[in-house]
């Protein structure tokens, strides 16, 4: 009897494919290369969820509090708070409200003195990537697509290193209330 192979058995680490290694080395966003500095080297997650946040304000916390448990274990939630130089004032203010609310929760967070900070979340860990300051804002006309790419590149780098079990990179919006079976 032949058994189907589980997609989570795809090559990782040194066995990862040449194309994947090339992508991470040449095309991934800079946060992907620095992620292991912010997370414990031996930390493992069952699932990863990427959420771009643009002008969400404190409402982002409601979405984060609705993240359900994952059947494969703890979840790494990557939130990319982002704006561009031309973002309206209300977006900038809402982003600063989001960051202030998250930093209120991030007391004792593991950071690098950089725009990435990690804290415990009831379902695993929360990684906040701040792309709202001079030199870090997103280029014009890249918006949510680039913010999702930043989160996905970080997730891919962790998956390749064996830090995430599920082969799925989940992406959602910052104003969503998640159903209990989201990761099923």
How does the language model describe each region?
Residues 49-50, 78-81, 125-132, 167-177:
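Extended hydrophobic secondary-structure segments that form protein cores and membrane-embedded regions
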Residues 66-70, 95, 184:
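Amphipathic alpha-helical scaffolding segments
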């Amino acid at each position: 009897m032949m058994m189907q192979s589980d997609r989570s058995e795809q090559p990782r680490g040194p066995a990862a494919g040449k194309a994947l290694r090339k992508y991470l080395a040449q095309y991934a966003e800079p946060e992907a290369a620095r992620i292991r500095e912010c997370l414990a080297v031996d930390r493992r997650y069952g699932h990863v969820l990427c959420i771009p946040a643009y002008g969400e304000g404190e409402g982002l916390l409601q979405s984060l509090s609705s993240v359900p448990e994952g059947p494969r274990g703890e979840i790494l939630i990557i939130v990319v708070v982002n704006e561009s130089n031309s973002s309206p004032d209300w977006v900038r203010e809402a982003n600063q409200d989001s960051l202030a609310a998250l930093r209120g929760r991030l007391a004792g967070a593991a950071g690098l003195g950089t725009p990435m900070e990690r804290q415990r979340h009831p379902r695993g860990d929360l990684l906040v990537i701040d792309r709202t300051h001079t030199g870090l804002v997103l280029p014009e006309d890249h918006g949510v697509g680039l913010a999702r790419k930043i989160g996905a590149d970080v997730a891919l780098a962790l998956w390749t290193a064996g830090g995430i079990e599920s082969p799925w990179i989940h992406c959602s919006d910052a104003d969503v209330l998640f159903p209990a079976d989201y990761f099923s």
